[in-house]
Amino acid sequence: MARHTQLRNNRRRGQRTSTLVALTVLLIPILAQDNKRGFAYVGDANEADNNMLTSSRTPLKWYYNWAPSPPPQVPSKNLEFVPLIHGLDEASSDSTSRQLSALPDSSTHLLSFNEPDGTTKSGGSSISPEDAAKAYIEHVAKFRDGSSGGRKWKISHPSVTGSGNGLEWLKSFNASCYDIDSENGCPTDFVAAHWYGAFDGLASWLGTLDEFYNTNGSREGDDRLKIWVTELALPQQDAQTTVQMMNSTLPYLDGLDYVERYAWFGAFREGDANEWTGDGVALFDDDGELTELGALYLGGEQNGFAVGQKGDGEGAAGQLLQLLVELDLKQVLR
């Protein structure tokens, strides 16, 4: 604080004005970012990587880890943690309710049933639509009305794979819900979606889900369900192709009114990528340096992130931005 006071006293009015203009120019791209962007945490044990992901200078505002409680490796003071009920066992477990009750008030949304139309080998929960509907009404809905989990949670419908099978599963799930409860079905607050593929396919899949939940369901205005894209990547492509896809995708999702949040699947090092996605989705190389994809997702040089930057060091742009943000603008203008 004393240093800032000295700076203010040593600056002339013209220099103060120049500082304000420079700060304004730097902050415009950051202020333009909303809170849609987050990441899926798959278990990166490198502290430097996690420090970069949780930096307040990134546009990242939330994260999840396919579990009802946050990982100890991720300091979450700058991020909202979003819990997930992965499968049937977690839905009916008293432990899940205790874990949710222990979360900070900043956690308000709850994801349910990860890829029930997928196999457990691929990370899915492998649940039939009928069993999922029964468990949803008996257990998951209780988190929504506050009778379990310590508060009233906003809950999602199950997040299926981005495929024809996923859509058919959702249709069967919805029908089963109304077979059990003809009046309410399986009430939900938002929709969770996954997409692995090219940009045009993503746009088509989101349009399909919006039509299924909103247009066909006659939802309008404030009643329209928002979509969260909780897994997103372009598998098995080279770095240049993947960067091109991300360059098209980020502004599209940021501008789409019915998409509320999204998370890239790639918050890890290239060597930690699975065989199916390939290492082109990774935000970090094996030395912990930001890939071109990683620098782009974290906001680029305008936010102080550059290709090759490591989490245990700060780029020049980042240092300048941090210094300017820490200045009390009201005092600078005096």
Q: Whereabouts are the PLM-identified features?
A:
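Fungal secretory targeting signals
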Residues: 1-34, 314-334
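N-terminal carbohydrate-binding/catalytic regions of secreted carbohydrate-active enzymes
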Residues: 34-110, 124, 133-139
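Solvent-exposed loop/turn segments at secondary-structure junctions
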Residues: 44-47, 67-71, 86-91, 114-119, ...
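Acidic (Asp/Glu)-rich catalytic clusters
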Residues: 51-58, 70-81, 95-107, 141-150, ...
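Aromatic- and acid-rich polysaccharide-binding/catalytic face
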Residues: 65, 83, 114, 170-213, ...
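Aromatic-rich peripheral "rim/lid" segments of glycoside hydrolase catalytic domains that contact
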Residues: 80-83, 87, 258, 263-334
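Active-site groove signature of glycoside hydrolases
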Residues: 104-129, 153-164, 186-195, 228-229, ...
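Active-site clefts of carbohydrate-active enzymes
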Residues: 122, 157, 218-249, 265-284
